[in-house]
Amino acid sequence: MQEHLVVTLDGKDYLVEPGTNLLEFIKSQDTFVPSICYNESMGPIQTCDTCTVEIDGKIERSCSTVIDRPMTVNTVNNDVKDAQKEALDRILEKHMLYCTVCDYNNGDCEIHNTMDAWGLQHQTYEYKEKPYEKDYGPFYRYDPNQCILCGRCVEACQDIEVNETIRIDWDREHPRVIWDNDVPINESSCVSCGQCATVCPCNAMMEVNMEGNAGYMTDTEPGSLAAMIDLTKKAEPGYGPLFAISDSEAEMRKERIKKTKTVCTYCGVGCSFEVWTKDREILKVQPSHDSPANKIVTCVKGKFSWGHINSDQRLTKPLVRKNGEFHEVEWDEALNVIADNFTSIKEKYGPDALSFISSSKATNEESYLMQKLARQVIGTNNVDNCSRYCQAPATKGLFRTVGHGGDSGSIEDLEKAAMSVLIGTNTAEAHPVIASRMKRAQKLFGQKIHVFDIRKHEMAERADRFYQPKPGTDLAWLSAVTKYIIDHDLHDKAFIDEWVDDFDEYYKSLETFTMAFAEEATGIPESELIKFAEECAKAESVVICWAMGITQQDIGSDSSTAISNLLLVTGNYRRPGTGAYPLRGHNNVQGCSDMGSMPDKITGYQSIEADDIRAKFEKEYGVKLNPKAGKDNHEMVEGIHDGEVHSLYLYGEDTGIVDSNINFVQAAFEKLDFMVVQDEFLTFTATYADVVLPASPSLEKDGTFTNTERRIQRLYQALEPLGDSKPDWKIFQAIANRLGFDWNYKHPSEIMDEVARLTPLYAGVSYDRLEGFNSLQWPVQPDGTDEPILYLEGFNFDNGKAKLFPLSFDNYFKQDEIYDIHVNNGRLLEHFHEGNMTYQTPMIKYKVPRAFVEISPELAEDRGIHEGAEVKLISETGEAVLQVHVTDRVKGKEIYIPLNNDAMENGDLGAINLLTNSDVDQYTDTPSYKRTSCRLEVITKRGKSPLNPNNFRVNKKRHPQYSVQVQKKWERSDYVFPGNQVDK
């Protein structure tokens, strides 16, 4: 195989690797070639024709040329320049240059920059206005009269995000971008990811927040912009002066528009991007090709749901309860109240009478300081975080089998896999950017997707095969599939012999897991399970993703263990495109646990009960540490009721809504002697507190987050804290010092340096190594070497071998005649959990204004109810009143309740956790949220739908195609390739 090819570029020879994109090679040599439709994150689209060069004497597009032979390339001769000029002129026939008064004139308009760099002074063809008006969606708008039909938005929607809404209608007299079958944006299947606006090279697609806000001359009254455009064009007869003036205005904008790299504060994907702000106004979010987890992909929350930052609901001063009511006070008074109460409770009842709940929304540094406050200052290990509510069972299963409690590879491995198996994860709504990577792999590269879920969500609809097991029975089919693979000699014996212990004992434990047993337990036909087992065993590479549908069961740890067992038996660890991926729910739930906000583990999952570990931290902290494991979230609530816990300090967690059996939890709050809540808002939980502290959200501080793939990333402060709110780390420091300690951190980087000294997993982590879009995936060696793929050097046990873990199953979920309906629950795309942050963005609330219950058509018919009906759901622990959305996403007596009940406005009305009980996973105390039964009482039989009629879920059909279908453009009678014109 030839290693290099000779490419002669403008008379100079270069050695180039075969398969290199010609345009990328030309750019790498600092040679300018226009390329308006090309984007490095999407590849060649071939619509603009501006990148033409001469290849071996013929004018061709460089963007779609792969270097597969020696070639001579000319970018400067007259024929090339003439072809490029023709292509540029055709663009200006569709796009009016009025740069100085354009909101997009921020230094990154690719039409402006290309025309300027090329040296275009006058256009040959007159601009032709199209017979279309602007189309406004809730978050972005489309201006057909500025659209050059490059197709980037189509490529992004169809083949990057794979939402499959946007197309170009090439057949009409005046082609334009359309949504679905040519409906307005707001009536389409658009999910408002915003990537079309991200990739648009000009002002055709633009965020609504940008319009009229970006420039010095764009904040005009409606109608006056047209006059300004006319005036500008008359005053700037050639493009040279226009570019000079607009460049000066763009330079001025740098003084008013601040661009700050940050990391998304919602789910665990860890999307990074620049946030553009003007004063406190958030203009746009712009992802980058350099964004390690998401590249240029976003979802509606990360791109647009930032209303919470400037919400009038933000807390700006501390609140102290006096005579039953909250009063605003200065920080000094609030800190004194906290210090006095912590001290008196500790003196009266001992340190273990105080408990602390950390936040998966906060930074690593802040999570570290909360556990340090609990352990060093108070002397208790009663500290936990919300991984107890969701991911602790997955971590347990991985600790049992492979030794690390995190994803075994990277997000890009999910794209590389030959087969993806999704179990109990609504990925397209809970982790939409990851779902896009998998949808793309399926659509373009043939990845096979298998989905096991009780609900027919989007990934189930798209799956190559969809299986609907009975609730809580995944362990049965997972173990039966594993047994079948071994029984039929399909297991990876070489991998097992070299890398896995305890095979014989494990295989013996599978004796009862026959396919017949699995069919009876799960309801999945034996033939389907056999076919899946054979495909799984024979696939070149397999990844398994799972989430709360697995972990929030009372056998969540065992089911997670069964997943890892299957991967070990088939040899699907230690290679690209393989492994276990328990998709983390929050932006920093992985990091919060990494930082030691756990009752039995200190940073990096080091046991607090180990003498040598405690000794290391005691030397750093200067105090003796409590050797006894503390209480977890579940045990804290029990401890309050039992009189063992008298004080609770929580931050960034609405425990009174998100814990299970919240009637029981709220009753516990009422029994506390003293309660502190620290948050952006006066949350439902905060209404029970004695002191409420105003905390700053992510855009108002520096720090790091660790995402689902163990990726540690920096976020930078974009805005000053609102009012008297403070970053959590500063609040913890103030409390520690008020209690007699001498914390003196000047910046979060110093906190991370301390973490690195104490934590082998983070040993090489530093802010310098995380500069900009750089990131590290733990474990990180002292020299900064990280591990995107775990276990390449062996598994995280003393002998380097993984362990197969025997399991059993007899845990059938049965409903009785009274509580005859199974209640499933989870996220919606638009909202995050209870919605405290997302409901602060008006257009998010417009899309999904309230919580509701999904009911199957057959259950609706049985109960005589219709869309919009109001029903009361009653369980053994409580009741909730909700409106009905009838959908075939659920079947039979399965119902689904989204988590977003807007608790700050509605209290606990309609909250799913009024119905859940206190049952937990026996190994982790994770609540069994998914094992809930209820009965249904009809209040009204029909009403207004709880969903906005423009919501994409309401009878909206996708319109998939491959890319922009540029051949349709080429087939038009009015199209001639510029190179052919030059040849003529």
From Swiss-Prot:
InterPro entries in UniProt: 2Fe-2S_ferredoxin-like_sf, 2Fe-2S_ferredoxin-type, 4Fe4S_Fe-S-bd, 4Fe4S_Fe_S_CS, Asp_de-COase-like_dom_sf, Formate_Dh-H_N, Formate_DH_asu, MoPterin_dinucl-bd_dom
SMART domains, A to Z: Molybdop_Fe4S4, NADH-G_4Fe-4S_3
Binding site for [4Fe-4S] cluster 3: C157, C190, C193, C196
Cofactors, names only: [2Fe-2S] cluster; [4Fe-4S] cluster; Mo-bis(molybdopterin guanine dinucleotide)
Keyword NAD: yes
Coiled coil: none
CDD domains documented for this protein: fer2, MopB_CT_Formate-Dh-Na-like, MopB_Formate-Dh-H
Assigned GO CC terms: membrane
4Fe-4S His(Cys)3-ligated-type domain boundaries: 79-119
Chain positions recorded as [4Fe-4S] cluster 2 binding sites: C147, C150, C153, C200
UniProt-recorded name of the protein: Putative formate dehydrogenase SAV2309
